[in-house]
Amino acid sequence: IRRDNACIGIIMLSAKSLESDKIKGLAIGADDYMTKPFSISELLARIDALMRRVQRLAPEKQTDGRLVSGQFVLDQKSRMLYKNGEEIELTQVEFQIMELFFVNSGVAMVREQILQGVWGEGYFGDVKIVDVNIRRLRMKIEEEASAPKHILTVWGYGYRWNG
């Protein structure tokens, strides 16, 4: 589901109530986890809260092929990135990583997800190529690459875009 639409909220409903089951459900991609029995009013409240969060995190998509995230504009037609109106030149791979980040804004992604999203499922190289490209992107878009504010490291996990 996440591969088809990264800006969709997922609530897992389960009869399994052990803490380890809840942790596993959240780790595999659920945004929320509810155990049976539950009330319909609680489910509806959680759906409303999740929808607010997803709408806030989703990039502002415009009909002209541009994605907007904070001070950044990713123009999919010209394959250009702009920060505060200034053009930032990107390689093809860097552009694809940024596109993946914009579509998954606020979502922590493991290196393997980034590899699959950019290089495809058939790539069998080292996942460290993601780190190399992230380092290059940070040098291009961050005020201070050593203290990033946009491409954040999620320690022990991967990266998250904060537009």
Where are these regions (language model features)?
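Short coil-to-helix segment of the ABC ATPase nucleotide-binding domain corresponding to the Q-loop/switch region
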Residues: S41, V107-V118
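Short, Lys/Arg-enriched segments at the junction into DNA-binding effector domains
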Residues: A49-A108, E112
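DNA-binding patch around the recognition helix
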Residues: L57, D64, E89, I134, ...
